Amino acid sequence: MKILTGNSNKHLSQKISKFLKNRLVNSNIRKFADGEIYIEINENIRGNSIFLIQSVSSPANDNLMELLLSIDALKRSSAKNITAVIPYFGYARQDRKVVPRTSISAKLVSNLIEKAGADRVVTVDLHSGQIQGFFDIPVDNLFATPIFARHIKKKLKKNNIICVAPDVGGTARARALGKLLNVDLAIVDKRRPAVSYTHLTLPTRWDVG
């Protein structure tokens, strides 16, 4: 097993490498003058299982291309299998058509990752669970809620805590956290009158328990 890091999650990759006592794959990632991304694997990885750690966070377009080109480079370097570890899965918000003439970017990005050569995807708290169904390869969607709950219990007093879901889509996550903490739940009514405008209505009552 070997670990390759992209530019978006270097600190996380280094911590994982140190924890596993498994050094990072030697690679060269740079840009040409026109902004085109260049990736080179500088060591023999033939027959190895590779974990590529790269988020599709800001700048999302650059990080997405870096992810895809890294997968392609690993595939062409004869890696045995490639697991794309994507802590933040960008373009996941657009998981369905909310207006008639728009793209479903989550599906397109899923297709690109699979076509590039990934054999498995590991991510954290997908925007919506159905995105796992956009892939024909295994997808492990990990949940950070138990980790947050442990941290909150250590840092805050229970009688000062209320879990708030920012919209209906976040209710399941907020409820799961509220249950672990045994605290109340509030749900915010979120509406988008326009693409760049969001209207929030704060709750007037709490769901206790």
Where do the protein language model's features map onto the residues?
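Conserved small/polar residues in nucleotide/adenosyl-binding loops
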Residues: 198-204
